[in-house]
Amino acid sequence: MSDQPRGALLPKKWNENRSLRDYFDGAVFFAALLIVAFRWEVVGCLVYLGIVGAVLVLSDRISDAFLPLILMTVFVTRCYDSFDVFIRYIPFYAVVLLCVAFHLIYYFKKPTFGTSFPGLVAVTVALTLGGIGSLSAAAYFRPMNLYYVLGLGIMMPILYVVAKPRADAEARDRFTRALFLAGCLAAFAVAIFYARGWNEFRETYHALSFQSSNNLATFLMISLPIGFRYSKKARAWIFIPVLQYLALLFCDSRGGTIFGTLEFFALLVFFCFYRSDRFRRICFIAIALLIVVLAVALLPRVLTFYRYDEKIPHFSELTFRQLLRAAFTSVVDNGEARVGLLKRSFADFKSNPLFGVGLGYTGNEDLYHPVKGAMNWYHMWLPQIWGSLGIVGLLCFGYQLFLRIKLAFTRREFPEVTLSLCYAGLLLMSQVNPGEFCPFPYALIATSIFILIEPPQKVGTTEPEETAPEEPETAE
C-alpha cells in the first residue's frame, strides 16, 4: 500500500472551491429542516446514511461527512423506542459500512498519535474488563452488551487512528459548524413540537413533554459555545445562543434547564472577557441582567411552566421567598428512578469493587426498564462508572478526563477553546443522562472534539508538528 494517500474521486473543483462545500452543507441542513417539519425521520435517516456513504467513497475528506451524520442523529432522536423499525434496514447499513471500509482502504493515511489517545486505550481496557467476576458469560456476550462495550471501547481508538491524520484546520472548522447547525436543528425541532401542541400548551401553560427532550437539550448544550464564538465575527450572531438557550428551557428537560442555565451564564461571563470588544461586553451583560430580572419578576409563572404548581402544596398561597425555597428543595424527588439508581450504584459497586457489575448487568430493571436495544443505564455518568466498571473504571475514566482537561487548558486558541467548551456542555448533561455512555453520537462527538483540539502530529510519532500560528479571529 502506498504511503501517499490517493486523490478524491470527485472533480478537483470540489476540493479547490470551498463555496461548493458550503452549498452542499446548506442543502443538507435545509433538507434536515424539512425532515423535522414533516416527520420524515425514518426515510431521512436512510437518505442521510446514503449521503454519508457516497461522500466517503467520493471524497478523501472525512470532514465532508460530518454534517449529514450529525444532523441525522438529531432528527432520529424523535424516533423513540423504534428499534424494530430501524433493524429492518440491516442490509442497507451493511452497504454503508462497505463505503466506510472503502474510504479507510482507498484513502489510507499513516496513523499519528497525540495526547488523548492513551485515555481512549485506558477506557477500552476498563470497559472490556467491566463485570468480570459478576457478569455471566451469556450476559457479557449478548449483542447489546457487546455493542456498548465495543462501541464505547475499541471503536473509539479505531476512530482516533482513522480520523487523526485527517484532522486539519478545515476539518475542525467544519466539525464545529456541524455541531452548531445540529444545535440550530434541535432548536427548530423544539419550536415545531410546540407549534403542533400549541392548543394543549395554551390550556395549562405547562412545558410540553416529549420523549426526545433530553437528547435535544444535549445537542443544544453542546452547540451553545459556538454561537458565542461566531458572534466575534459578526454581531448579528449574538442572539443565536440566546434563542438556543430559550429552546433549551422549553425542552422540559430538568437536567437541561439546570445545567444549561449554568452553562449559559458561565459562557456569558467567559466570552464577556475573552477577546471581546466593548459592544459585546455590553450585550452579554444586558442579556444576563434581562434574564435574571425576568426570572425573578415572573417566578410564579416560571414555576407553573415547569409544573411546580402540581408538585408544591398550596402553591398559589406561598410568598415569593417560600416559592423560591420550594423550587430549590423540590428539584430532586426522592421517589424518582434516578435516586433509586444512585443508591443501587453503591450497592453494585460493593458487590464487585474492582470491576463493577458490567454494562450488560440487568439487575436494575425494577427501577429502570430501557427501551429495546438500549442498556440498563444508571442515567448518571459517575454512578455509571463506579457501578458498572468499579475501581478500574474510575481510574481509567479519571485518567482520560485528566488528559482531556490538560489538553483543553494547553490549547488556548479560540477554535480549540470553543470545542473544549462544547465538550463541557456534553459532560454536564452526562451527569444526569446517559450522555457519553451512548457510543453514537455522544461518545463519537467527544472523541472527535479532542482529536481536533490536538495539534497536528508527525506521522508515526507523538511529536507535534511545527505549524504557523493561526490568525486571530477579529470582530467586524
Stretches with model-predicted labels:
Residues Y89-V100, F117-I132, Y140-A163:
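Aromatic-anchored transmembrane helix interface
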Residues Y194, L246, F250-C251, Y274-A326, ...:
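A membrane-periplasm/extracellular boundary helix in multi-pass inner-membrane enzymes
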Residues G131, P157-V161, E170-E200, F210-Y274:
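Alpha-helical transmembrane segments of multi-pass inner-membrane proteins
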Residues F30, A54, F264, T418-E476:
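Transmembrane alpha-helices of multi-pass inner-membrane enzymes
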Residues L34-C45, D84-R88, P143-L146, Q211-N214, ...:
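Helix-loop-helix junctions and helix-breaking kinks within/between transmembrane helices
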Residues A234-A236, F273, F279, L367, ...:
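Hydrophobic transmembrane alpha-helices and their immediate junctions
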Residues R202, A207, A327-L389:
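Long extracytoplasmic/lumenal interhelical loops at the membrane interface
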Residues D3-R6, K12-Y106, G133-A137, L426:
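N-terminal signal-anchor transmembrane segment
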